[in-house]
Regions:
Chain A
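Cytochrome P450
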Residues: 1-408
């Protein structure tokens, strides 16, 4: 019986045999609920940059220096396509799919709203949301940290950031939740995307007539150079990217970090004793250890780099979460150590596409942790409950059932 | 052996043994011969190691041997897996990967493609050779719930999905129409023009043989021949796309033709216009609009004749055993006049897609089939089909998945992005038009050669348009097909036909 191309291991002639290492980024049997540790272990013996013949065949980059070299070289490694395996008519996101300098005006338009000053100003609102969400979850005793906390918090923050009508919180949360639950259902995603964009479009109209100091009003007014403002389509596209980028990421970094924290009673006791003093260090270490985004690149110009022949049309996957656990950069990289000296990592990538929300994302985890330990004495994994996960370009924890001892 | 396709054939072999079951190019296959021949085929299959549930793939143009092989396979408890005789080796290989047949049979013109796809087919002449011979019977009877066929359908995905019917679903489908349509009793004469590898061809064959009718199989649509056949053989049932009825009416001999034998005349795939209705009404015939899809078993609803006269474009209100709803995305029923997705429920619908639990769960929810089609019910519950959610191009009655064409076109060097849309075509109704963007125009002849090598001929684009600008996108980052359709509405009038 012949096999269709999709099932084949694809190894083009330019790929040398010593760089081939089998790994299925979507469903590798070696990866478990502790995704980061098991993923790292599975590829520990693979070369720094290797060719995975599965999923149409693509390069995988696991070392921090190699990742930095590729992320800062848009001339050879383009963001134009980000699908593995490559698909016909890949989606195009503003500004994610734009190589510099085209992406710069859009980043400049967003930057002031995501800087430390703006995020600091948002903190009281983040705190209020975190408290409210944790209180609601605690009412339940045993609950799913993902569904009840990690998934709802970033949606609320997104609405706050955009200046959305918070009386529609539940409606929009429900929309967001269904969107991320139906990732494999193209028809549902299409319908839900339409509804989300409908909400955004209504928001644009509202902010045109009654502007405020929130992000959507800022998008409407932002000078893109030469006095040009963004078209409605551009604003919608940017809003959609922020929606995608702001939810799944913070949700899953938080989820994986709390999965680990649930198994570390000593660290919980320290955080309980001094949440305000230690939450920043915890957030930093959570971000270093539990990155969830792997960034694809398309080779658009042949280049030999680090002994690897990258050829036009090859797909490359930068394993940011693995790069942030590079044992050449970190002592005991798989240990969550909040006393670790702060060192650069690549969870947020680097170069022209450095995550614009990195200050906000870190702040969300920090504030959530402070509010958590105001209310929680200790918590642990609920015994014998499965913790499903998915891998791919974004790694996600789909459920995290926890048992909680509330603070007295 | 109760409520199986095989039990119905055995019944008609007893009751109407000499009546033709199938007439193909003048060659007659009686129910008695069909019964004996298919029994011998079943015994041969079992002897070759075929077990209940195994797949038997068939890649051939229509022939009486094909018919015998279908009923023999079902009698042996195996599952018929028809392969489109137009398929290219790559399409065949992709299909075989999911069906994994125990045996593959091929017609003389299909052997080479199958070999190239990596299998060693048996020759259809092996089946032909069993037309005469000693009585033979398979040692066991098929069960009602055993699957009988996997029919490949084109959906909105790039790869076809296999619709699975069982003995029980196919007999229930036939039972519904026997109850509902007294105009097609046993002994009725039916024209069928569809290849047996299509849903229409396979379902008509099995439906009308379960019902004890005679099928006149035509190798292709020829309006003059059809008109002649209807009169000469006193044909009673005729189903086709509206364009076929128009071609027949355009024949000079139509004016004096005697069509009084026709009792059940249905049209699907496109709307029946008032003008078409009136042309045939002058001959005493009411063309009735149908709606259905492979997944529901075939037809789901036929417009009642007395209502079709006033509302030719409507499709009826379901059937004796077939319920229809039109719903909003959240599953609640639409108000009369409100558009929504058409849902259907019947004992004749598929049990699911072959080895595809995700797509099955999507299509079958709480006992209802979600059609992916948009429709609207009027205040009397009569359905009007509005549009298909699935991205299909329907060319000469054959469904083409736009995504599949796009996948192959995008493989061609120099093409950055491409969409396939339907261009109107006087002969086929619709035909594929491809709009692509790249750094420069590509060699269209070479592109078409690439498509020819990887796609069945009817899927190969007939028009190719180059766009110097990137194609329009939605805010979600996806290409916008509605915007491209609008930009290229009249493109077929300006562009040359490239094949």
């Amino acid at each position: 019986m012949t096999k269709a191309p999709s099932q084949l291991r694809v190894i083009p002639p330019h790929v040398p045999a010593h760089l081939v290492f089998d790994f299925d980024i979507y469903a590798d049997a070696r990866v478990g609920s502790d995704v980061h540790q098991t993923y790292s272990a599975a590829i520990a013996d693979a070369p720094d940059v290797f060719w995975a013949p599965q999923n149409g065949g693509h390069w995988m980059v696991q070392r921090m220096d190699a990742i930095s070299a590729i992320a800062t070289d848009p001339e050879h490694f383009s963001v134009r396509e980000m699908q593995i395996p490559r698909v016909p008519n890949p989606p195009f996101f503003i500004p994610l799919s734009l190589d510099p300098p085209e992406n710069l005006p859009y980043r400049r338009a967003m930057a002031p709203m995501f800087g430390p000053v703006a995020v600091k100003a948002m903190e009281p609102r983040l705190r209020a949301w975190a408290g409210e969400i944790i209180d609601a979850a605690l009412q339940k005793g045993t609950f799913d940290f993902m569904a009840d906390v990690a998934k709802v918090f970033p949606v609320s923050v997104f609405m706050e950031l955009m200046g959305m009508d918070l009386s529609r919180l539940h409606e929009f949360r429900d929309l967001a939740e269904r969107f991320f639950e139906n990732q494999n259902d193209a028809a549902q995603i299409e319908a839900l995307s339409g509804q989300i964009l409908g909400v955004m479009k209504a928001l644009i109209d509202e902010k045109r007539s009654t502007p405020d100091d929130k992000l959507m009003s800022h998008f409407i007014q932002a000078d893109m150079g030469g006095g040009r403002t963004m078209s409605e389509d551009e604003i919608l596209a940017m809003s959609f990217v922020l929606f995608l980028g702001g939810m799944d990421t913070v949700t899953n970094v938080t989820g994986f970090a709390y999965q680990q924290l649930a198994q570390m009673p000593d660290l919980q006791a320290r955080l309980m004793a001094d949440a305000e003093g230690l939450s920043g260090a915890f957030a930093d270490e959570a971000v270093r250890m539990f990155g969830v985004v792997n960034t694809p690149r398309l080779v658009v110009k042949d280049i030999d780099l680090m002994g690897v022949p990258f050829r036009e049309g090859d797909m490359v996957l930068n394993l940011l979460p693995i790069g942030s656990r590079d044992d050449r950069k970190f002592d005991q990289p798989h240990v969550l150590d909040i006393d670790r000296k702060k060192v650069a990592h690549v969870t947020f990538s680097t170069g022209p596409h450095l995550c614009i929300g990195h200050v906000l994302g870190r702040a969300e985890i920090k504030v959530l942790t402070e509010e958590w330990f105001k209310r929680v004495q200790s918590f642990s994994l609920a015994a014998d409950k499965p913790r499903p996960f998915r891998t791919g370009t974004v790694m996600a924890l789909e459920a995290l059932p926890v048992s909680v001892n509330a603070a007295s | 052996m109760s409520q199986t396709v095989s039990s119905a054939i055995a019944w008609w072999a007893r009751m109407r043994g000499d009546q033709p079951a199938v007439v193909l190019a003048g060659e007659v296959l009686s129910y008695r011969t069909l019964q004996d021949w298919s029994d011998r085929v079943a015994a041969m299959l079992v002897g070759a190691g075929v077990e209940p549930g195994d797949r038997v793939a068939i890649c051939s143009t229509n022939s009486l041997a094909y018919v015998a092989l279908i009923f023999g396979t079902i009698r042996a408890g195996a599952i018929v897996s028809p392969i489109n005789f137009r398929y290219k080796p790559r399409e065949i290989a992709e299909l075989l990967e999911t069906t994994e047949p125990r045996l593959v049979f091929a017609g003389p013109d299909q052997v080479a493609a199958l070999r190239e796809a990596g299998v060693s087919p048996r020759d259809m002449s092996m089946v032909e050779g069993l037309r005469e011979g000693r009585r033979a019977t398979a040692a066991y009877d098929p069960e009602p719930d055993w699957p009988v066929v996997i029919i490949a359908t084109s959906g909105s995905t790039a790869k076809p999905k296999g619709v699975v019917f069982t003995n029980r679903t196919m007999t229930a489908y036939a039972a519904n129409w026997s109850i509902e349509e007294p105009s097609a009793p046993a002994g009725s004469k039916v024209i069928t023009m569809a290849p047996l590898n299509t849903s229409a061809g396979f379902v008509q064959l099995v439906h009308y043989t379960i019902a004890g009718c005679t099928l006149y199989m035509e190798p292709q649509f020829d309006p003059a021949r059809a008109l002649d056949l209807i009169q000469r053989e006193r044909i009673t049932c005729f189903a086709a796309v509206p364009a076929f009825f128009e071609f027949i009416a355009a024949r000079p001999e139509f004016a004096n033709a005697d069509l009084s034998s026709l009792k059940l005349v249905t049209a699907g795939g496109a709307r029946v216009s008032r003008q078409l209705l009136e042309t045939y009404r002058a001959k005493g015939i009411v063309i009735r609009q149908i709606y259905g899809q492979t997944e529901v078993g075939g037809n789901a609803t036929i417009m009642p004749a007395h209502l079709a006269i006033d509302m030719p474009e409507k499709c009826g209100w379901g059937g004796a055993f077939i319920d229809i709803r039109v719903v909003r995305p959240d599953g609640s029923d639409c108000a009369p006049g409100e558009q929504g997705e058409i849902l259907m429920r019947s004992p004749g619908m598929m049990i699911g897609y072959w080895r595809n639990p995700e797509e099955t769960a999507r299509a079958l929810r709480d006992g209802w089939l979600w059609s992916g089609d948009i429709g609207v019910l009027d205040e009397n519950g009569l359905l009007t089909f509005v549009d298909r959610l699935k991205d299909l191009i329907i060319s000469g009655g054959l469904n083409i998945s736009a995504a599949e064409v796009e996948r192959v076109v995008c493989e061609f060097p120099g093409i950055r992005e491409a969409l396939a849309i339907a261009a109107p075509d006087p002969k086929f109704g619709e035909t594929p038009l491809v709009v692509y963007h790249g750094d420069a125009e590509v060699d269209v002849a070479a592109l078409i050669a690439h498509c020819d090598a990887n796609l069945s001929n009817y899927k190969v684009p007939r028009y190719v348009a180059f766009s110097a600008d990137p194609l329009p996108r939605l805010a979600t980052g996806k290409l916008s097909k509605p915007a491209v359709r609008e930009l290229y509405t009249d493109a077929h009038l300006r562009l040359p036909k490239v094949r």
